[in-house]
Design a protein with these regions (language model features):
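Conserved phosphate-binding/catalytic loop of the ribokinase/pfkB sugar-kinase fold
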Residues: 92, 99-140
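A glycine-rich helix N-cap at a beta->alpha junction
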Residues: 76-94
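Hydrophobic anchor at the start of a short beta-strand
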Residues: 58, 85, 154, 210
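Glycine-rich phosphate/adenosyl-contacting loop at the front of the ribokinase-like
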Residues: 1-63, 68-71, 308-323
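Conserved phosphate-binding/catalytic region of the ribokinase-like
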Residues: 1-8, 32, 196-323
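Active-site-proximal loop->helix
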Residues: 68-81, 101
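Short beta-strand scaffold segments in enzyme catalytic cores
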Residues: 49, 98-102, 109, 218-222
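Conserved phosphate/ATP/ADP-binding segment of small-molecule kinases
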Residues: 148-153, 160-231
Length: 323
């Protein structure tokens, strides 16, 4: 009997994000009203939902509590057809991590509460996994190393180094993964370079594929096996909330692993998905589906050759309608 297979696996903390938009700065003791509100899964759920919505068979390795926020987050995630929640633990008495996001017209503020969670472990003998994502700011779990030895492609990311040290020890550990996806500020600080292009090339000394995201300016990638530097622009959208856009980018890029596309097309789809996700509030719930991609490309006709992506999205959308 053939072993079960997953395209993507995401492990980490699932949050409940409470997003308030259009929040004026209050005076001390004053009450202000937001223009919009959204409750959405956040944290690692941003990546998991984004990958699943592109048709990748995606699993979430995490836990939520039996509190009201956890129950609501669980219900939202359970509505995603391609998202496998067999490894999402529902833990009695555990408070689901929560982040309140206050978005004004020019700035954002966050308030987070998170209790210590039990460590997660991918079971031996579990389904094979095409790709997974890890944080490089802590030691890789043994189960990640085990999956990589079995053929899983390991993507890595980092967060902002609030210490300001930007230790190059991170670079020396990049041989533990296959693809590194930082944003441009992170990449330039770790490599001590002046621009994203030089940062991508420098990262290519340590990892097979380095992808540096640049927000509204697109992305640049350096592929060590070919020595090629590939740059793609982003598309222009009316941005409402950038929460989770980086997560949507990396998950969408991971979802293209089995497409057989050139690197440039994979980056273009990932960038498009990230851009479309900022048009509405929240991270996970704003990740686009193929039908959203088709609708945008057809209506807006952005510059460049989108024929491959449009054909794929249209075919995926037809499949969704038939389910």
């Amino acid at each position: 009997m053939a072993r079960a297979h997953l395209d993507l696996l995401f492990a980490g903390s699932v949050f409940c994000d409470l997003v308030f938009a259009g929040v004026p700065t209050p005076e001390p003791g004053a009450e202000v009203y937001a223009e919009a509100f959204k409750l959405t899964p956040g944290g690692v759920a941003n990546r998991a939902v984004a990958g699943a919505r592109l048709g990748a068979r995606t699993a979430l390795l995490s836990q939520v509590g039996d509190d009201a926020l956890g129950v609501r987050v669980d219900a939202i995630l359970s509505a995603e057809p391609e998202l496998d929640l067999r490894w999402l633990r529902r833990k009695p008495g555990y408070q689901t991590p929560v982040t309140v996001s206050l978005t004004g017209h020019h700035e954002r503020e966050f308030i987070t509460y998170q209790e210590e969670a039990d460590p997660v472990e991918w079971p031996e003998g579990g389904p094979s996994v095409g790709a997974t994502h890890v944080s490089m700011q802590r030691d890789l779990p043994g189960w990640v190393q085990r999956l990589r030895s079995a053929g899983t492609i390991v993507f890595g990311g980092v967060g902002w180094d609030s210490s300001g040290l930007w230790s190059r020890s991170i670079l020396r550990r990049l041989d533990e993964i296959d693809v590194f996806v930082p944003n441009d500020l992170e990449a330039m600080r770790y490599t001590q370079t002046e621009n994203a292009h030089d940062a991508a090339r420098e990262l290519g000394r340590y990892v097979e594929l380095a992808v540096v995201t640049r927000g509204s300016r697109g992305a640049v990638a350096f592929e060590r096996c070919t020595g090629r530097l590939v740059e793609v622009p982003s598309v222009t959208v009316a941005a409402v909330d950038p929460t989770g856009a980086g997560d949507v980018f990396v998950a969408s890029f991971m979802a293209t692993l089995g497409f057989g596309w050139p690197l440039e097309q994979r980056l273009r789809l990932a960038g498009l998905c990230a851009a479309l996700s900022v048009r509405s509030l929240g991270g996970a719930v704003s990740a686009p589906r193929p039908c959203d991609i088709t609708q945008f490309l057809t209506a807006e006709s952005p510059p460049g050759d989108w024929s491959t992506i449009l054909s794929w999205a249209a075919a995926q959308g037809s499949s969704e309608e038939n389910i």
